[in-house]
């Protein structure tokens, strides 16, 4: 090849393709992180961010979000409860600690530095910082998967997989949630790389304990990112115990490393809650007959808990139906990548290389165990669910799917050595898989440019109201009850208790706060109360929700005020809540009602705020 066709060791075609790849990548990063970014979209992602800020302040692994169930656990365990230093045992610790390091570096531990004081700004700056962390982790994961798949197959399949990853709309959406999925993707990809090296050594009848240990370390870090991934790890432990040398010992060695990494946190969970699984263990019931939020909001979940535990038939039925639903939604949960589900067809193909043939069974076993874990602990219909682990398998399943398609493509009679023969199937797969992103790109760009920066995740969040109004109206020793305590804790930097379902539980938690010389400032009600279509259910809204009148005040006032505008009348806030006999003790304490935003966010307080 002449020098005119080579630049720095690369031929012109390769150089141009790589330049285009990085240009597209830069454009996508700008689009998702700057142009179309509205804020963090996941409640649990927001909660992990505020835990990270507390860690950055030197407050250890504490949270300003108080769950009734966590309070119940601590009380049952006979622990001293301090609402100003409430230990979090719900979230896995690694992601908040990473957020803490980044927030400390940018000064995010100082609330006033990033407080939203300008009316025109609706995106919280620290939301973008958290999202940027996820983007960086995602890009690292793309690179690791390129190296892994190049080792398993070849650079063409690795390159196509990398392109499909960056063109997956779901991958980018996860970077906007605040959830640890991109961290998990990076760690899982690293673990797979060393698992494959261990497998190669095993096939060649030589021991590679170092690769197995490194894989176990990455899997342990994965577990510290999300406890549910322990199910995935168990899948690998089963395979290693039977097929990796030394047999049996390999599996116990992996479990030993996992215990070494997680032991400290298990002991702390036991110390704070009386359960090594902490409050996260109670999320088990999200996969059974009760929703997780119902359990988490109650400060006495024992009755519901025991009912569910002994209902074995319900357990089996719900677990089975959840697994079947996961299979039905697998395509979207794998990032809507056309060839990813073809991994299961690749299981039927007799690959010539033994390592490729055996590695797919490791992946399958880990996926099956992960699917079982998701079924037991609960997975909603949203493909951005915090428990969504399918996305971790998307790159490796995509690679096997591409290999399978390449084998079929090679059997088509096309000119040998031509571009169509070499890259035609890759182009088809990429164009179809990128469809969701391509279709939304123009519309989202126009919307972002026309909104002039007035974008946020509404409903249910409107950060300026919390960051400026609510924060300035309250003090550091104030406690706020809310149906979205994670938003109050993150955007307003105030201790927030998840609004319980019963008045008696509210009064109990209120007494806990006052006994600690804290002041309950009021109650914040937002559209979050209606997130689950509560009016469209078999049980009437309010049947098991004492605060239903409080939640309905906003929509009621909005509807009636519009009807009375022409008559010069306005409906006073708190119309329904003040008529409720159950809520009378509470409304007497918090009589002042302030419409914070568009009849959708109300603040019930002791003292009057200005009326918006």
Model-derived segments and spans:
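Signature aromatic-anchored transmembrane alpha helix within multi-pass, membrane-resident enzymes
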Residues: 15-25, 209-217, 233-238, 255-259, ...
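Perimembrane helix-loop-helix junctions
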Residues: 4, 199-201, 231-262, 266
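Hydrophobic, aromatic-rich transmembrane alpha-helices
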Residues: 140, 145, 241, 317-367, ...
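Membrane-embedded, lumen/periplasm-facing catalytic core of multi-pass transferases
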Residues: 414, 419-487, 521-524
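Membrane-interface transmembrane helices that cradle and orient dolichyl/undecaprenyl
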Residues: 191-212, 222
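Hydrophobic/aromatic-rich transmembrane helices and adjacent perimembrane loops
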Residues: 175, 180-184, 189, 222, ...
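Transmembrane-helix signature of polytopic, membrane-embedded enzymes
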Residues: 18-21, 110-124, 140-167, 185-186, ...
